[in-house]
Amino acid sequence: MSSDIPCCGTTFSLYVVIIIALVAFAGLMAGLTLGLMSLGLVDLEVLIKSGRPQDRINAGKIFPVVKNQHLLLCTLLIGNSMAMEALPIFLDKIVPPWLAILLSVTLILVFGEIMPQAVCTRYGLKVGAIMAPFVRVLLVLFFPISYPISKVLDWMLGKGHGVLLRRAELKTFVNFHGNEAGKGGDLTTDETSIITGALELTEKTAKDAMTPISNAFSLELDTPLNLETLNTIMSVGHSRVPVYFRNPTHIIGLILVKNLLAVDARKEVPLRKMSMRKIPRVSETMPLYDILNEFQKGHSHIAVVYKDLDEQEQSPETSENGIERRKNKKTKDELFKDSCRKPKAQFEVSEKEVFKIETGDAKSGKSENGEEQQGSGKTSLLAAPAKKRHRGCSFCILDIENTPIPDFPTNEEVVGVITMEDVIEELLQEEILDETDEYVNIHNRIRVNMHASPENLPSVITSITQSSSGSTSPNQTSHMATPDSSPTTKPSNSSPTRKPSVSSPTREPSDSSHSMAPKHEESTQTL
């Protein structure tokens, strides 16, 4: 069967041009469908805010077009379908039917699908930005047809929203961008480690970072501050030492080592006579981010970790109101018990009093006997506390002499101690070592590649120790942990009434970090 239009005429040439235009239009619609629809709204917003200059421009042109994804999809598919359906009709006019079918399939497959989709997959952002004005015209032309269909899709599938990565996916995404992954990323190992640690910190609680109470270095309330105790504190190298009363788990406060600089070891002043600070108590289920936020307020950089025995008895499986109990979680103030905070009721000032102070109405007042008092408004204004507590806050001081020993609920069992350094180590996912550390990991007893020696101690302490022969024996400091022998605690032979300066026979000093242990055996035996 011959073609309807003879070859090489004007009509024939017009049909050929139309066929080429239809193939190009179909290919453009197919390429834009893949290229534009593969660009998520979140990806475009990221490029607009933090992409390269050219990518920002391209993403800014594409975003208004891609914003209504269902409308764009319907417009591009309608245009593609019209071109593909019209192509065989024009081919049938200039070639035989069998050749029209063969040519239409070949042209659509090669130039209408494969080539444009391959190009738009690679350069989708650039091609989409160039063709954005043309797509806007198509949206207007096909609006009467595409808009109703897009609304049906919105009703059935919902409007398209940007899909955000979950936490686990985001960590994997960051790891892929590390230079160690070999995928062309430029993130260093430290950068990926810190980002991953920041993402994982939300899932970790105080129980994951604390130092067990059996490994924490602490002092008894009635410990005499003699040469032995001061040497032990010096060799441990901690800046804060918890203080307990009778039972090692009954920690009532802490003492700053810098406050002991002026102590005369010959007077053997009891520890209870020194200025001590209150120590916060945190639940073992409290997230590390909340603990870090509390530490940043300046109340304290160390806290006692307790376990609520009542919560253990009411497990989710046996509790009748397990679902409601999860909904009614404890607040941050209930998990982080800071006795150093100021009572709110003590400093509540009414709006009228504040107005009087600001307007000067409180500058003069009358006492109970009717006498005028000048400057009372100024005094009231100065008496109002500042929002930020200073370091010398009287609420943070533990007055043992004038107040009873603090007592705590019996259902709260002390299980460990946590410091700001512990939280930072979990964030960095690396151990922070200082000059006094012997072990990288106190549980696995991995030794640090540094050796503490008596030369590291101050010369004054060394000379005093050497001159006072007989006052300190090696077994007095044998409570310090050594890698080859289990630590034991023995009382001092020079004074039978002295109490050991450590709380537990198996305790290893670790106030600054759960992975930090004291100096090695040579240093403590020399002292």
Swiss-Prot record:
Main location: membrane
Disulfide bridges in this chain: none
Transmembrane segments: 16-36, 71-91, 94-114, 127-147
Protein's UniProt name: DUF21 domain-containing protein At1g47330
Cross-referenced PROSITE patterns: CBS, CNNM
Residue ranges, annotated region (Disordered): 307-335, 358-384, 464-527
Cell compartment(s), UniProt: Membrane
Organism field: Arabidopsis thaliana
Keywords per UniProt: CBS domain, Glycoprotein, Membrane, Phosphoprotein, Repeat, Transmembrane, Transmembrane helix
Membrane topology reported for the UniProt record: Multi-pass membrane protein
Membrane-side (Cytoplasmic) residue stretches: 37-70, 115-126
Origin organism lineage: Eukaryota, Viridiplantae, Streptophyta, Embryophyta, Tracheophyta
Segments of skewed composition (Polar residues): 502-515
